[in-house]
Amino acid sequence: MRVVRCVRRFSASRAVSGQNTTEKIVQAHAVGLRPGHRVASGDYVSIRPAHCMSHDNSWPVALKFMGLGATRVHDARQVVCTLDHDVQNRSEKNLAKYRNIELFAAQQGVDFYPARRGIGHQIMVEEGYAFPLGLTVASDSHSNTYGGVGALGTPVVRTDAAAIWATGQTWWQVPPVARVELTGELPAGVSGKDAIVALCGVFGRDEVLNHAVEFAGPGVARLTVEQRLTVANMTTEWGALSGLFPVDGVLLDWYREQVARAPAGHARLTAARVDALAERAAAMQPDTDARYAKQLTLDLSSLTHYVSGPNSVKVARPIAELAPQQLRIDKAYLLSCTNGRLEDLEAAAAVLRADGSVRQVAPGVEFYIAAASAEVEAQARARGTWDVLLSAGCIPLPSGCGPCIGLGKGLLEAGEVGISATNRNFRGRMGSKDAEAYLASPAVVAASAVLGRIAAPCEVLGLSPPAAPAVRASVAQCGAPAAADGAAAAVEVLPGFPRAITGELVLCDADNINTDGIYPGKYTYEDDIPRETMARVCMENYDLDFQHNVHAGDIVVGGYNFGTGSSREQAATALLAKGVPLVVAGSFSNTFSRNAINNALLTLELPALLQLLRERYADAPSQATRRTGVFLTWDVAAATVTVTVGSPTGERVLHQRVGEFSANLQEIIVKGGLEGWVKHALAQSA
């Protein structure tokens, strides 16, 4: 049973001058800020990442890049291409795509890593691209991994990647930042994977959805860098946009070891770079008055082995609850960017050779293994770890994503049960939708493979069964945004961008309105649909009454996690076609937010407004789409919103600050979206 304590609320204010580490890193990589502006959560900023990685999707990004009219990558040192997803596929079609990516990289002078060299995220870390206190992005959702080494890593969509290739920059809205304080020390044998699976379960009500997470507290120093990488990696499944660990002595020592092992003359792993990092680290720590949206705590010493599933990351239970159920398994997996590192392979090997001899994988069970990179596999071979795994009957796969993404050999078949040290167990992801998948640590996966059922390592090691203690954790909301009661420097408003946006609010009172509800999937791949038709089918899967309840110029208000689901850009463009200039929600899917701005649709997260409207209509008959007679005015120059009743000049019921929408972002909107902005920038530089 978990214990979550309720603690007092903290206040937060835009007027507070302190910055957290996330804001400091963004500040260092932002371009075009007005003089003296200090980046804060909510701000829309243009960013120039240190690096941008793409993998098998490099060719679609390249096609979009060329479609923008670009011919040369803006900064070849910024871009990294890796091949890691479908590396077992030897079909001519896939090999041709791989050849195209390699040729493009060679022509552009971009760093390229071929298939079977390793998973892109692992390469980014071990080759020193994702480096502490830098901003590194990738066109992949597990870019959060880089936070394990103190780099701010966050995903971008393909259009963003193409923009970075062409211009060196894209945009980002700085998310609310949640501070997660870790105390205590993990019990013997319990791993970073157990910690993040527990976090996903204990805080499984979207507490950190679309937040940047910063880990802090005395427990951090007791986690190895490999454990930090695992935790940061799965902050994606926790719902966060990044998961950042601090730069401390443990990390600096780890980098000194990497430098010692690196080939002489390595371009990025150098003693001088690590020394410079050590000098800079203190200044990049959070200020004492740094702002956080939430404060969470977790006592690591209260954890045990955790397993999530079946088919859900957020259903997490102690192994002591599952082991007695004798849940048989058919397949086990030790691989991926989550748990394919040397420490993970050694944890599994330690279970397999518990009594000095190598235990065999149970009859009828297939145990698949793959190192996160060729370098990791070489290290495992040199230490004898790989031989132990093979001697036990494990089935080796090449370094790559493979079964984790549902590609290649060893997928789950209908009726089968699998346990995996990967990051996602969504139904159908690792094979048949009629299979069941569980997630666990390498040690639990190995023990389960040996015994043929979900089992704790102690059952193989001959130790006492693990306890299932109450998890000691807490969460505190840090208050609402400050009222707009003080003077602030005016935001520059560009010609062609409205100084203020005003409209009547139309409430679509539902959480998790998905992209299929906004723009039906049956139209997604009909590229010749007229704008008028897009407007007519907008929101038809959500509410047929939306059409006659919403007029051009209205502002749509949605619930939490608006735009969840697929990455279809038409979810944004259909709303624009309907004449909606601005969508407000309690929160947005990150992909929808990016697609919205990239296609010139404005968005604002205003949970206080959503709460106000829900309270206003709490006793009214249910209505999916409701005209409210309530008006919102967004003063772009003042970075405030004002909500009034009856008319734009009526009774004021809400007035608060919002993030600054910088001139650089305004220019994207004025140019019709990110693609239009890139084309304009390329024309200007020609």
UniProtKB/Swiss-Prot annotation:
Keywords for the protein's UniProt record, in alphabetical order: Amino-acid biosynthesis, Iron, Iron-sulfur, Lyase, Lysine biosynthesis, Metal-binding, Mitochondrion, Transit peptide
Name of one Pfam family that matches: Aconitase
Cofactor list: [4Fe-4S] cluster
InterPro entries in the record: Acnase/IPM_dHydase_lsu_aba_1/3 (IPR015931), Acoase/IPM_deHydtase_lsu_aba (IPR001030), Aconitase/3IPM_dehydase_swvl (IPR015928), Aconitase_4Fe-4S_BS (IPR018136), Aconitase_4Fe-4S_dom (IPR036008), AconitaseA/IPMdHydase_ssu_swvl (IPR000573), Homoaconitase_mito (IPR004418), Homoaconitase_swivel (IPR039386)
One cellular-component annotation, GO: mitochondrial matrix
Interval spanned by the transit peptide: 1-17
Subcellular location: Mitochondrion
Pathway as given in its UniProt record: Amino-acid biosynthesis; L-lysine biosynthesis via AAA pathway; L-alpha-aminoadipate from 2-oxoglutarate: step 3/5
Molecular function via GO: 4 iron, 4 sulfur cluster binding; homoaconitate hydratase activity; metal ion binding
GO biological process: lysine biosynthetic process via aminoadipic acid
SUPFAM superfamilies from the UniProt entry: Aconitase iron-sulfur domain, LeuD/IlvD-like
Chain residues that bind [4Fe-4S] cluster: 337, 401, 404
The protein's Enzyme Commission number: 4.2.1.36
Function: Catalyzes the reversible hydration of cis-homoaconitate to (2R,3S)-homoisocitrate, a step in the alpha-aminoadipate pathway for lysine biosynthesis.
Stated family: Belongs to the aconitase/IPM isomerase family.
Protein name: Homoaconitase, mitochondrial
Gene name per UniProt: LYS4
